[in-house]
Amino acid sequence: MSGTQMSAFLRQYLADEDKKIRAQFKESDPNNKLILWMHEKTRITEEDLARPYTEDEVKELCLRTKVKVDMTAWNCLWEAKKRFEAKGRFVNKSERFINRMYVKAVRKKMVQPYPEEFVAQRREVVAAETKKHNISRLDRWQRKKTQNLSAQESSPARGAHLSFIDAMQTHEDQVNANLSSVSQINFQVEAIARPAVSSSDLSGIGDDEDEHQQSEFQDEHINCPETAINENSVRCDPINSGRMRTGCINSQGNNNTESDPDYYMFGTQLSSLLRPTSTQEPDDQVNCPETEMNESWVRCDQINSESMSIGPSIDSEGTITFQNSESEPIDVDSIA
C-alpha cells in the first residue's frame, strides 16, 4: 500500500498544534523537558505519512488491531440528543417520538449539520493520527520479534555451554573418585606391608616408671609407724584347692582403734578385705550353704589367713580343721 502525501490543511493544522504545545510548555522550564520529548516522539511528520505498508504489515494490523467507529463525531443529531436528554424530553418516550424530535430540531435549526469540507478535513487529521499510531505499533512489534529471535539463537549456544560445563564437572568428579580409590588402595597396601608389633617388643616399657613410683611411695610411708603394716598381715597362705565356704564372714569393725583417723590423714586406709576380722564359730559358718562359692569365683592371691576366717575343712581322717592357727580341730565322731 502506497503512502499518502500531506495536504496544505494538514500541514497548517499540525504546525498550529505544535505552536500551541510549545507556547504552553516552554523549553526554558526544566520540568517540561519530558513533555516536549514525548511531543517530539508522537508528532506527525511527512515521512510518516509517506511510509508505505507492506502486505504482511497490513495483515498484521488487521489481525491485531480492533476497528472502532465513532458515530458521534461531527454528528448534529448526537448534539440534539444530548440537549433533549438534559431537559428530560426523552423520559418514557417511544422511539417514534424521539425521531420526530430530531427532525424538528434540524428543521427549526436548533442544530445544524456539519459541512462536508469540514468533515473531510477532520477525517484527514484522524487518518494521519491513525497512521502514526500504526507505525508505532509495527515498530514495537518488530522490536519484540527481534528480541525473541536473538533469544532463540542464543539459547542453543547457552545450552551447549551448559552441557559442556556439566561434562567437565562429571569428568572432574570421576577423576576425584579414581584418585580417592587409588589413595585408599595405597593405604591398605601400606597397612599390610607395615611390620606387626609383637608383645616381646613391648616388654619393659614403663618398668622404670613403675619402679620410680614404687620407690616414691615407700619413701613417703617409711616414717609413718602408725600406718606400718606387719609383714605377716599381708602374707597370703595358699588357698584350699577344694570347695571353700566363705559365707557368713563377719566383717564387723570391732577392732577399730584410735589410730583410724591416721589412715584417713595419710591416705593409707586398708581395704575391708585386709582388716583383721573376728573368728566365727564353726556352727555359724556351716549353716550357710547358699554362700558356697567355687574357687574360680574367688581367686585371691593375697588374702590374710591369720586375720580372716576362711571356714572349716574336712581332711581325709574326717577331722574338721580351720586355717586359722587359733582354732582347734573338731572331731566328727564326737559331734555325732
UniProtKB/Swiss-Prot annotation:
It comes from the Eukaryota. This is Telomere-binding protein cav. One of its GO terms (molecular function) is telomeric DNA binding. Transmembrane segments: none annotated. Residues 308-327 have a biased composition (Polar residues). A motif (Su(var)205-binding Pro-containing repeat 2) lies at residues 289-295. The keyword DNA-binding applies. Binds to chromosome ends in a sequence-dependent manner and is required for telomere capping. Residues 107-328 are annotated as: Required for binding to Su(var)205. Interacts (via C-terminus) with Su(var)205 dimer (via hinge and chromoshadow domain) and with moi to form the terminin, telomere-capping, complex. Interacts with HP6, which is also part of the terminin complex. One of its GO terms (biological process) is telomere capping. Residues 137-158, 199-218, 308-336 are annotated as: Disordered.
